[in-house]
């Protein structure tokens, strides 16, 4: 179920150069998934909680969506992923180098915008929901909904190349659809007027850049 796969916070404007600013938006935190795993005493290795995060990060590395600061610090990891992904376990990298979190500052401007569209709001399309859909197809409805998984079936998906390639195709389709929205790059971040309006409304707001097709918000 959707609520079992999510740890999201509302979008907040990032001021200044997205790659130089220390402010960042949280996307996912493994502690949430590990907490569920431990509370339900699931018989799996806690490293499985990083699986879906590692898939997303690898795809972004392979598609040049990482930010300048990240490349300066971890460029060798990106090169390893591109050269020999099968022998580069990004789960341990996320655990040891990223403290179990994915956050917007890891990515360049396009990567941030796509993450906000696909990983930052509980609306379709939504990356955690796509992971959950894969679990449903992989295990089948009967087993997926059984007490065996206790609503955490995604944690039991084998972390192998088939899993990555299947999800990579899904992410690719989402990315192509997103690019097809024809965003005005000058509006990827809220303008001063947009920020003022959101502050005036004094409620949780979702900012959308100027786009040719309003399908994502319909």
What positions do the PLM features span?
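Compositionally biased, low-complexity intrinsically disordered regions
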Residues: 2-4
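N-terminal low-complexity, intrinsically disordered segments
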Residues: 6-94, 98, 102-107
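Polar/charged low-complexity regulatory segments
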Residues: 11, 26-28, 32-34, 42, ...
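Residue-level detector of alpha-helical secondary structure
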Residues: 82, 132-135, 168, 172-179, ...
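Amphipathic protein-protein interaction modules
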Residues: 86-166, 170-173
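Metal- and O2-centered redox machinery and metal/ROS homeostasis
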Residues: 206
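Extended, Lys/Arg-enriched charged tracts that mediate electrostatic binding to polyanionic substrates
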Residues: 209
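Non-Sec secretion/translocation targeting segments of pathogen effectors
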Residues: 216-218
């Amino acid at each position: 179920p959707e609520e079992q796969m999510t740890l999201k916070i509302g979008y907040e404007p990032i001021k200044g150069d997205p790659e130089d600013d220390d402010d960042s938006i949280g996307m996912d935190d493994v502690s949430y998934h590990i907490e569920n795993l431990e509370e339900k005493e699931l018989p799996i290795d806690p490293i499985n909680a990083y699986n879906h995060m590692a898939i997303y990060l690898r795809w972004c590395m392979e598609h040049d969506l990482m930010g300048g600061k990240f490349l300066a610090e971890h460029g060798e990891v990106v090169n390893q992923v591109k050269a020999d992904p099968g022998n580069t376990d990004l789960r341990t990298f996320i655990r040891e180098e990223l403290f179990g979190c994915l956050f917007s500052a890891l990515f360049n401007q396009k990567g941030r915008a796509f993450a906000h569209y696909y990983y930052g709001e509980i609306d379709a399309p939504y990356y955690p929901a796509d992971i959950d859909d894969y679990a449903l197809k992989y295990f089948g409805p009967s087993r997926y909904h059984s007490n065996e998984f206790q609503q955490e079936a995604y944690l039991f998906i084998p972390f192998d190349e088939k899993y990555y390639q299947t999800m990579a195709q899904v992410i690719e389709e989402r990315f192509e659809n997103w690019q097809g929205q024809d965003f005005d790059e000058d509006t990827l971040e809220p303008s001063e007027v947009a920020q003022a309006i959101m502050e005036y409304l004094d409620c949780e707001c979702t900012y959308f850049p100027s786009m040719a097709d309003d399908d994502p918000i319909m």
